[in-house]
């Protein structure tokens, strides 16, 4: 998306000006990928830590299979799965750590469901998970603008002369974890199939980058959805410029409701 941004200045919502009033091709703060390794490590470390130490609990998978994938002995896993007093559960709401041993120090195996999902199930789960995430992140994002402590953490995300794709990742670690955990919750609460999750992730990431692209993309998702449903990059660009309103990531319903009741904070994040 950075390449698209640099090669299509005519799509930019607001072009940063130089000292002599000329258009700036590359906004301040935009860096080459080779200079962003530290940022990548910061972003990935907490996610990798969770991914490599916690057993994955996918829908339609037995607790026994889950525990076996977490390096628990098959017999012990079967006993635990059938013991009503066991502390192990197949729900994601009760995390289970990998049984770390010398031979298996990290969680590298996944217990997968035996059967593939129907296309209808995948479509419904994708729609439901994005709807749930949109509502949850609306509340999370609103809190980042009204609660003093987390407001300070969120402020750097708004410090830029011109919004551009790399702003997507200009986040405090608290915000990063919030993004990922809310996305996981949205998938898990409806017991989505692992294949749905596989499709959800690239769509989720792409839409986040598109929102921060600073571009009026001809193929923007808000142009594909029914009119008024999708917020899109323009709405999010206005949010970054004003600081208030536009808390919903993908759609518009919750923001519209907040505006109707008249409680949408308007101040800019500093």
Predicted features by range, described:
Residues 190-252, 257:
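Functionally important transmembrane alpha-helices
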Residues 1-155, 159-187, 248-270:
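Non-catalytic, topology-defining segments of multipass membrane proteins
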